[in-house]
Amino acid sequence: MQENIQNAIQQAIENAPERKFVESFEMAITLKDVDLKNPVNRIQEEVRLPSGRGKEVRIAMFAGSEMASKARAAGISVIDPATIEDLGGNRQQARKMAKQYDFFLSEIPHMGTVGRFLGVVLGPRGKMPRPVPPTLDPAMIANGLQSTTIVRSRDKVTFHTAFGSREQGMDELTANAMAIWTRVTSKLSLIHI
């Protein structure tokens, strides 16, 4: 399978026209003979890519005071918890924020407020924030998320996930694609790409 994936990546690189931006690589996976109407059969996995995503991941954190300064030091955008209620009342602004960031983190005391006011926007996009305990440095979580991609099938038999960018080498892209393939095949036995 590794050779097939490597050949597919090579073919995509050779056949792609020249662009004025750094292209991402996506893998399309089609499931066969799987009933996705049953939520147990759906795939929802976070895969840590061995060679990273090839692009910077945008992370935001709902935090105040001390945790906010730690987050800023780690390069994480900080959203003031006082604005959560205002964002919840302005759906357009909340959607814009959800589109702007790849992952969200939150201090534990703010999780309920985020769920109440922004859950309608963040939940369906799979972007509900991960809780950060007060003893944990948000930089550790952010470093892990920099090389993480989400594989989510929902109720569709064909789904896509990003696994790298044009700036990465063939071996890095192949390793990333194989990591996703291995994780998905461990969840299901009947898969065709």
What are these regions (language model features)?
Residues 83-187:
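Long, charge-patterned amphipathic alpha-helical coiled-coil/hairpin "stalk" segments used as oligomerization
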Residues 7-15:
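Interdomain regulatory linker/hinge segments that flank or connect interaction modules
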Residues 47-109:
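Extracellular/luminal Protease-associated
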Residues 1:
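OB-fold/S1-family RNA-binding modules
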Residues 15-67, 90-91:
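Translation machinery proteins
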Residues 24-30, 42, 46-48, 78, ...:
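Residue-level preference for alpha-helix termini and adjacent loops
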Residues 191-193:
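Conserved small/polar residues in nucleotide/adenosyl-binding loops
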